[in-house]
Curated annotation (Swiss-Prot):
SUPFAM superfamilies: ACT-like, Carbamate kinase-like. Belongs to the aspartokinase family. The lineage of its organism: Eukaryota, Fungi, Dikarya, Basidiomycota, Agaricomycotina. Phosphorylates aspartate, the first step in the biosynthesis of amino acids that derive from aspartate (the aspartate family of amino acids), including methioinine and threonine, the latter of which is a precursor to isoleucine. GO terms for molecular function: aspartate kinase activity; ATP binding. Disruption phenotype: Homoserine auxotrophy; the presence of methionine and threonine dipeptides (but not threonine amino acids), or homoserine, rescue growth on proline nitrogen source. It comes from the Eukaryota. Keywords: Amino-acid biosynthesis, ATP-binding, Kinase, Methionine biosynthesis, Nucleotide-binding, Threonine biosynthesis, Transferase. One of its GO terms (cellular component) is cytosol. One of its GO terms (biological process) is lysine biosynthetic process via diaminopimelate. This is Aspartokinase. It catalyses: L-aspartate + ATP = 4-phospho-L-aspartate + ADP.
């Protein structure tokens, strides 16, 4: 066991710890922002229960989110980065009680190097992005350390150049209020989650320090009027760091020995520069795409880093530092799930658990279809299709990392930890993370028709573009021009149906009016264009449909009986998904109709019992 931390509670010797037994399995648990924000007590109990039951636990956390997603920490951080590039607002006074004004020097509480977060200083709390040094250099302060650096190796940083405090008019940037809101929310969470004492005091100081470091970073960005993609990554990573500090402290406060693991510098220059780890294909956006070897190297390093925690429970930031081409550009907002997946691969975990606020994957959205049932087992292909067509399961690329390692993924409810959840199993023909074979689906749900689809989902806010060409051009040239136009506009097509001179495409309606008009104008050079708005994609998904006869006929006949018009039909090459486009106003009706006709069990004693087992 590492000795970097000193006791912060009188019951330190009684803390629950991971075992040193190499034969015991690792379980990696990923908690979403809402779970961290609302169910911290449950998280600490869940971690303790898994350790008591003989597992070694590592947890990965997203940035906090409480009431609404728009007020989640990540969204607020992105808002602050946008505000940093706005002109400062003039004011005659500070206008914010207890907060740093635009003319004040940022406040940096003195860090106690031997405290609970002391380990973080020497291993993880180093510079999170080199671009800040470049910002400071442009400001003539190249000797100043990054405000994101560990305080163990520097004195409190000076604030970026600000207007003179003698000025009668202070400048208050727009991001001030946003940073204050982030700080206020995390301080309130710390006070609500921990009993008073040195540990809570230290946590509050850490929150103050991180938020004021963020403020200084935004000041510097405002002065040069630029935030690079890697700088934005660093700004966004503050959310995971704040959340994990609260979770790590809450675990310790409740008797679980934990260690904060900040991954700001897990990707070093050797990984970034390794030509074999980065694909030479720059892609359409001009950003080099990371190859699988990069993620293999990263998972290995993550496994090494987490094993260094010894018996402490690693509490891992989902943000894993600047990567070539920017984390947000390479991966997007789902980087926390990917981090958890790579941790599971690096630790050779028996299972990756994704804890949400729902019991698992259902046959349909239970908020829209009251008769929806929990699906106990699902294949990776089915989960990927459901995610792509409207159900928030887990990103397919994230899923691919653990499935390649034959590690199952279990989706569970943080409010109902005793529930079985839904398990995404790797193909059973290959070795997995566990030695035991996964239970057969027919054993769990006896009497269920094996040809039955798995789930039905809806994706709304869809538009359909129909392009017809009367020219006798070759079809490949016709399609090439269409997709070249869509590529230049940055449009991703969800469904497509083609003939030699006609193409129908369904896509999400994310374009504003001007961009859509520009796209239509460009496409009109190729052929006649019509646009249908307020549409939805209805998708029936199920691996068993590959060998079923009449699934499509049953689906479309059911919609016809319900007087629901079909605008477009598409079936994937994998044969596990049948999709059609309908009017958005019919979406909920269609969901219930298809669920009743295609996913309801025949009423017999055997299937009644199966239905009970699925509840």
């Amino acid at each position: 066991m590492s000795s970097a931390s000193t006791p912060t509670a009188p019951y330190l010797e009684d803390l629950v710890r991971n075992s040193l037994d190499q034969n015991l399995p690792w379980v990696v648990q990923k908690y979403g922002g809402t779970s961290v924000g609302k169910s911290l007590d449950n998280i600490t109990k869940i971690v303790g229960s898994y350790i008591d039951n003989g597992s070694k636990v590592a947890i990965v956390c997203s940035a906090r989110s409480t009431q609404t997603k728009s007020l989640g920490t990540t969204n607020l951080l992105l808002q602050a980065s946008r505000e940093a590039l706005q002109p400062a607002m003039s004011s005659s006074g500070d206008g914010r009680s207890g907060s740093m004004s635009g003319t004040a020097t940022p406040f940096y509480p003195k860090r106690v190097g031997s405290g609970f977060f002391g380990k973080d200083q020497s291993t993880s709390m180093t510079s999170s992005v080199s671009s800040l040094s470049q910002l400071e250099s442009q400001l003539g302060r190249s000797g100043s350390p990054s405000p994101f650096q560990s305080s163990s190796s520097r004195s409190p940083p000076r604030s970026p150049a600000t207007p003179s405090q003698d000025s009668s008019i202070s400048q208050e940037p727009a991001f001030h209020a946003t940073v204050d809101l982030i700080k206020k929310g995390h301080l309130e969470a710390a006070r609500a989650s921990l009993k008073g004492g040195p540990l809570r005091d230290e946590l509050e100081e850490e929150i103050e320090r991180d938020c004021e470091s963020l403020r200084s970073f935004l000041y510097a960005a405002q002065i040069i009027d630029e935030i690079s993609p890697r700088s934005q990554d660093s700004i966004v990573g503050t959310g995971e760091r704040l959340a994990c500090k609260i979770v790590a402290a809450a675990l310790r406060d409740r008797g679980v020995d934990s260690e904060l693991v900040v991954l700001d510098n897990i990707v070093d220059a050797s990984m970034s520069a390794a030509s074999e780890a980065v694909s030479v294909d720059a892609g359409d956006q001009g950003v080099a795409q990371l190859g699988q070897e990069f993620y293999d190297q990263l998972s290995f390093r993550l496994g090494e880093r987490l094993r260094e925690c010894g018996q402490r429970v690693p509490v891992v930031t989902g943000y894993f530092g600047p990567v070539p081409g920017s984390l947000l550009a390479q991966i997007g907002r789902g980087y926390t799930d990917l981090c958890a997946a790579l941790c599971a691969v690096g630790l050779k975990a028996s299972e990756l658990q994704v804890w949400k606020e729902v019991d698992g994957i259902f046959t349909a959205d239970p908020r829209k279809v009251p008769s929806a049932r929990l699906v106990p087992i699902i294949t990776p292909d089915e989960a990927a299709e459901l995610t792509y067509y409207g159900s928030e399961v887990i990103h397919p690329f994230t899923m691919e990392q653990v499935i390649r390692a034959r590690i199952p993924i279990r989706i569970k409810n943080v409010e109902n930890p005793s529930g079985a959840g839904t398990v995404i199993y790797p193909d059973v023909g290959f070795p997995r993370g566990l030695d035991t074979e996964p239970p057969k689906a027919e054993r769990i749900v006896e009497g269920v028709d094996e040809r039955m689809p798995t789930a039905v989902t809806i994706k709304d806010e869809i538009i359909v573009l129909n392009i017809h060409s009367n020219r006798k051009t070759l079809s490949h040239g016709f399609l090439a021009r269409i997709f070249g136009t869509l590529d230049r506009a940055g449009v991703v097509v969800d469904l497509i149906s083609t003939s030699e001179v006609h193409v129908s495409m369904a896509m999400q309606d994310f374009l504003n009016r001007k961009r859509l008009e520009r796209l239509v104008k460009d496409l009109e050079k190729i052929g006649e264009v019509t646009v249908s708005k307020d549409m939805a994609i209805l998708s029936l998904v199920g691996r068993n449909m590959r060998n079923a006869i009449g699934s499509a006929g049953l689906m479309f006949a059911s919609l016809a009986r319900a007087m629901i018009n079909i605008e477009m039909i598409s079936q994937g090459a994998s044969e596990i998904n049948i999709s059609c486009v309908i009017e958005n106003k019919d979406a909920i009706k269609a969901l219930n109709v298809i669920h009743e006709s295609c996913l309801s069990y025949p009423r017999s004693p055997a299937t009644e019992m199966a239905g009970l087992q699925l509840q």
